Amino acid sequence: MKISYRAFVRQVRHASTTASKGATTSVTSSAAGQLKSEPAARATFLERIQRGPGFQDFFAVKPASRLKTDEEEHVDTSVPYLNSIDFNGNGRKVHFEVYGCQMNTNDTEVVFSILKENGYLRCQEPEEADVIMLVTCAVRDGAEQRIRNRLKHLRAMKNKRSTRRHPLQLTLLGCMAERLKEKLLEQEQCVDVIAGPDSYKDLPRLLAISRHYGNSAINVLLSLDETYADVMPVRLNSESPTAFVSIMRGCDNMCTYCIVPFTRGRERSRPLASIVAEVKALAEQGVKEVTLLGQNVNSYRDRTAQEEQDSLKATPVPGFSTVYKPKTGGTPFAALLRSVAQAVPDMRIRFTSPHPKDFSDEVLEVIRDHPNVCKQLHLPAQSGNTQVLERMRRGYSREAYLELVQHIRQFLPNVGLSSDFICGFCGETEEEFQDTVSLIQQVQYNVAYLFAYSMREKTTAHRRYKDDVPINVKNERLQRMVQVFREGATQLHRKMEGQEQLILIEGKSKRSDAHWFGRNDANIKVIVPSIYVPISGDSTARKSFGVGDFLAVRIEESNSQVLKGTPLELSNITDFHSRQLIQ
């Protein structure tokens, strides 16, 4: 005989009341009779209620020993319809294609670490892969179009594969995956798995579900605390002398043109200790240069150290403002940079991408006082016009930016500067653009990343402004920006001729096997011939140099993008800096 819902509720209430009075009897005789005909699962459920605490137990303070528990009882929390699925890759091969910024490169190493722990292998050729993963970028429309074009090619490759013998899974990761979500599944029906930047730990499950059921799987949830601090990235190029270390994720600045806060989420920082440990591990692997990464890297604040909870409040540089309340507590970026620099004195340290508002004097002091922290700063201006900067919600004026540049160059006389600029932002007039041109001329940058504005959905600019600058005008302004930048960079680099600089050799020159290329402190490429050189401190011994060697060179020639030098000797950061102080 079946029990109605109301009868079942009455049984549950009766069982709870009986348990709260300490009774050891079961349900009423009539209910007991009904239970005999009920399924075992329902009877077990009622018995558990009887053995557990009653309603009154939640209002009375009792010793834990008086509460009835069943320590040996195990509750199965697994999902029944997934129990038969094996999340392990079992040797399936993964091929990665990375688009966009350095953060995507680091994310790829995190993803491979997660997949490797779950039985996946990496392959270099897409034709050999069981899974092809595109790590995507959504900052500009051009990047998205390249990825869409690549998907068309991969769709054809997938259709040629035998679905039974060697099926191919296509996976989209990163910012484009989060931004477009279901649209990608509808428009690009060849995609099997979509995972946002904060859901990479879920990839083994998503891949298994898609493979088992033949349906697309998606997880693009953003997190308030995921930093992947517990994942040790597996380097994709173990031979490279350089590496990336992610120290924080997300961005709170909410610039009107930028999609990053919507695809990467709110700011959250890794614990300082985990960052230092990863950098030390890289040093043991032979890495000579590490770049600390974050969408707003110098707003880093580690709030896990209790002794630092009441430390200084984060105050923007004078003349700069934020859209959020000042952040308090935690270990600031200056302390992290100092800790990393001291932990690996013979390793170069860089960081990107910062916001100008967070370049405090404490950060500048660390850069000045530690020779292994590169004297190179990225100062993204975006525009040289105050009205455009207001529409962009950058939080500073043209004048404030120029004052910061002057202050930094007084603090660090030989600093190398790089920047980002956007032309053709919503409503930009010719007069406003001329302010950008004059700013580039006035500051003079060693490196610049110049772009025509690309409207992004979900951004404040998309909701509030009109993309009203014609594409031909944008492109014409972009060419003018490039020309002005190159003129300034040429003048800056000409001043380096005759200087001795320390470069880190990264590889063979693309134009000649008889030459190597490396980068100096300002992150400018330097080309040198392959010759035998003395070793620092031993003028009698001579040897060749190669990837991963620090080489002292004298700059002989220059242009806006590349320097050419003469090798002097093999050296290291400490010896080279000591010799420069003597000179």
Curated annotation (Swiss-Prot):
Can you quote the record's cofactor note? Answer: Binds 2 [4Fe-4S] clusters. One cluster is coordinated with 3 cysteines and an exchangeable S-adenosyl-L-methionine.
Q: Give an example GO cellular component term for this record.
A: mitochondrion
Superkingdom of the source species: Eukaryota
Gene Ontology biological-process annotations: mitochondrial tRNA modification; regulation of cyclin-dependent protein serine/threonine kinase activity; RNA modification
Presence of the UniProt keyword Iron-sulfur in the record: yes
Coiled-coil residue spans = none
Chain sites annotated for binding [4Fe-4S] cluster 1: C101, C137, C175
Function (record text): Potential regulator of CDK5 activity.
Q: What is this protein called?
A: CDK5RAP1-like protein
Source species: Drosophila melanogaster
